[in-house]
Amino acid sequence: MRESTLMEKVTRRTISSFIFFIVSSTILFLAGKSSAKISHNGDNNVTALFLFGDSFLDAGNNNYINTTTLDQANFPPYGQTFFGLPTGRFSDGRLISDFIAEYANLPLIPPFLEPGNSQKKLYGVNFASAGAGALVETFQGSVINLRTQLDHYKKVERLWRTNFGKEESKKRISRAVYLISIGSNDYSSIFLTNQSLPISMSQHVDIVIGNLTTFIHEIYKIGGRKFGFLNVPDLGCFPALRILQPKNDDSCLRDASRLASMHNRALTNLLFQMQRQVKGFKFSLFDMNKSLRLRMQHPSKFGFKEGEEACCGTGKWRGVFSCGGKRIVKEYQLCENPKDYIFWDSLHLTQNTYNQFANLIWNGGHMSDSLVVGPYNINNLFQIP
């Protein structure tokens, strides 16, 4: 099938140039100042937000690294719905992290690599990188892996000690919320790059979870206590992976979906184990997998008109990762109204979808499908001293 052939060609690594950096950074700064209701200037009780992981949270770090357009979204039509220009976010507008910052009365959290005044980093920092995984080997050399994101966080922690002093910095680190989305690329990359696993699926999941466990313990040692997690969505049902289905039918890519399920079971077990064994460790886990499947199965129930096809892309389900025409495949189609779609491109979601997810993550027990969040919601975590 031609779509599958194109997708295999598209899967990784082309040279790109940076687009709209200065303009986009200015818009982001102004948007952050205007949209958030800042009420804690000089407030010692401010709760900061730190973000780690992949494209579900990356607000533009990949704009500033030597990578390819497969891992960048700094060209139109990305960003068209909210910012009016591309910002590096893999969506038509805002991400979950942007909405959470707004609900917490914080400015838009700046990417770690964004040039500018370090004072902007005193309410939190976004370390996430599109394409990143818990494994160093995942798209190695083209993304900022979780281990490097941790190194960047340690630099900010030193900056905080300089700005606030040792004791005040320690209090702020402890009060901060750490939101993490990681794992999707560790599994989807196997299929997108046509690899074969040298180990069993369960062993692969164990290594991913092991690296994530080490990361959490490192943040905890520095002083972090309040963590939020997005689990891995049903990857096999994403348009980019569905077109790789060898049966040439409309089903999801079974092994990709299976890896996501295995990861999520292991992640849930890990977090509840840590809650029992690690003093002061508190967490919120968002079942992104279930939430996305509900919307794909019943799009109209959640205000969508299209539950499977992407808004932007090429081929069946617009599953070829061609949105914007800056990747290997230059031709692409763009829907009229992204708000009607769950998927923005073949691997990412629309602002409308992220907005719904952010509401669930923040409000927890007040939504119709609230069982997807627990044992705390993110609002609860922000309220804990």
UniProtKB/Swiss-Prot annotation:
Is Zinc included in the keywords of this UniProt record? no
Glycosylated sites = 45, 66, 194, 211, 289
A GO CC term assigned to this protein in UniProt = extracellular region
- Alphabetized SUPFAM superfamilies for the sequence: SGNH hydrolase
- Annotated coiled-coil positions are none
Would you say which domain of life the source belongs to?
Answer: Eukaryota
One GO term (biological process): lipid catabolic process
Q: Which Gene3D superfamilies match?
A: SGNH hydrolase
Q: Spell out the subcellular localization from the entry.
A: Secreted
Signal peptide (from-to): 1-35
Keywords assigned by UniProt? Glycoprotein, Hydrolase, Lipid degradation, Lipid metabolism, Secreted, Signal
The enzyme's first-digit EC class, named in words, is: hydrolase
Give the enzyme's EC designation: 3.1.1.-
Q: Active site: which residues?
A: 55, 345, 348
Gene Ontology MF annotations: lipase activity
The keyword Secreted appears for this protein: yes
State the Pfam families in the record. Lipase_GDSL (PF00657)
Protein family per UniProt: Belongs to the 'GDSL' lipolytic enzyme family.
Quote the protein name from its UniProt record.
GDSL esterase/lipase 5
Q: What is the lineage of its organism?
A: Eukaryota, Viridiplantae, Streptophyta, Embryophyta, Tracheophyta
